[in-house]
Amino acid sequence: MADVRKLKNYINGEWVESKADKYEDVINPATGEVLCQVPISTRAELDQAAVIAEQAFEKWSQVAVPRRARVLFSFQQLLIQHKEELARLITLENGKNLSEARGEVQRGIENVEFAAGAPTLMMGDSLASIATDVEAANYRYPVGVVGGIAPFNFPMMVPCWMFPMAIALGNSFILKPSERTPLLMEKLVELFSEAGLPKGVFNVVYGAHDVVNGILENETIKAVSFVGSKPVGEYVYKTGSANLKRVQALTGAKNHTIVLNDADLEDTVTNVISAAFGSAGERCMACAVVTVEEGIADDFLAALRTAAQNVKIGNGLDDGVFLGPVIREENQKRTIAYIEKGVEEGAKLTVDGRETGLSEGYFVGPTILEDVTTDMTIWKDEIFAPVLSVIRVKNLQEAVRVANQSEFANGACIFTNNAKAIRYFREKIDAGMLGVNLGVPAPMAFFPFSGWKSSFYGTLHANGKDSVDFYTHKKVVTARYSLKGYEE
């Protein structure tokens, strides 16, 4: 273990060895190999980064908006050039297959593209005449130092909807990546620096509780963006808000997919397999529950079981692999416990992913549990793994009632060609992101990303116009300019 590389924090444009007395292994979940070690940094290191970020903000916020945008555009170009390298890093430390990793890199690039539009996004409003000789203008200004807390499941896409936009709008940023997937951030830092970002504007501090609490408590940090589990998200929102910070916390999900009798069978099965088992189910937009109308249920489920049993499982770097590992051994054990709990509570296990035949890594195969009811633990909890619950329903109205009982409301999908059914679904379902005849309704960067109920805490969502509002505050100037002396 002596030759394992120890990662460093990135503060004021330099890689700085941590003062941490504890390091955690960063593991390739497909093999169990230790890739490097990440410091569990101290609160003092976070506070040091905050001082640096505040100093950098004073200068960066005064840089002309088009010039800031050019730095973001250069960053975007570098990301494109290094797309394959970035994708391989994601697969190495996260486990998702290379095709999915490439897709994640592309979504990250699109987020940077959106942020590069800062000159337009920063525009305010004005009214030439609100009274005699009086005009008003509304200006946007950056809020200051921003903190970001990112999850392991999208080590590029999620950070890239945080720091590029915040920085393009004139803020400085401190990011705490997941300690499980920190390697990719090293490369992003390198490329952002190469793009011309001044020292101190973007800082990275690895760690756990002390760093999170530092972000939430340090008075220099004015806003916090979080993506992760519901319990941590609640804590982040309550603690950050109590310390008078802006907070957006995107948390758990239990996304429902409704399959109606007129759905295209082959297309629906393909989409559900991808949505339920892609990225090992470790995404907040995964399909966790299918509610299927009785008329199509037998044919749909027979085809779904066959497709699930034919999924290729393995190392995401290998050709043809669809399903990679879950992130850690404890996640694997937790998932198996949920499957067994479902069977214990009366669900029918029709596709069993507990045994994959793979001797190394943390794998769980596609799992389907049928005859699920809303009082079961597997229906209530976010499992965050390739486990799909199935409920048969009589009609669309029942399917919507089932979905709306969940405490989560991130996304929901429907498969049908009935326009009336689609409209009913759109109006009645409780969820922030909806899909029609597609499995993962994750919107593009210029639309807001986030859910309702226990899937989100805050008022301003990630991405879209909401992100511009989140990272800026407004100043309205009302002025009187008498035209006396200029009369014709």
Swiss-Prot record:
Keyword match Metal-binding: no
Enzymatic class: oxidoreductase
SUPFAM superfamilies: ALDH-like
GO molecular function list: malonate-semialdehyde dehydrogenase (acetylating) activity; methylmalonate-semialdehyde dehydrogenase (acylating, NAD) activity
The entry's keywords: NAD, Oxidoreductase
Pfam families from the UniProt entry: Aldedh
Binding of NAD(+), residues: A150, F152, K176, E179, R180, S229, T251, E382
This enzyme's EC code(s): 1.2.1.27
CDD domains reported in the protein's UniProt record: ALDH_F6_MMSDH
Pathway: Polyol metabolism; myo-inositol degradation into acetyl-CoA; acetyl-CoA from myo-inositol: step 7/7
Active site annotation, chain numbering: C284 (nucleophile)
Keyword flag Signal: no
Reactions mediated catalytically: 3-oxopropanoate + NAD(+) + CoA + H2O = hydrogencarbonate + acetyl-CoA + NADH + H(+); 2-methyl-3-oxopropanoate + NAD(+) + CoA + H2O = propanoyl-CoA + hydrogencarbonate + NADH + H(+)
GO biological process: inositol catabolic process; thymine catabolic process; valine catabolic process
Purpose of the protein: Catalyzes the oxidation of malonate semialdehyde (MSA) and methylmalonate semialdehyde (MMSA) into acetyl-CoA and propanoyl-CoA, respectively. Is involved in a myo-inositol catabolic pathway. Bicarbonate, and not CO2, is the end-product of the enzymatic reaction.
Complexes and interactors: Homotetramer.
Similarity section: Belongs to the aldehyde dehydrogenase family. IolA subfamily.
NCBIfam families (UniProt xref): MMSDH
Name of the molecule in the record: Malonate-semialdehyde dehydrogenase
Organism: Listeria innocua serovar 6a (strain ATCC BAA-680 / CLIP 11262)
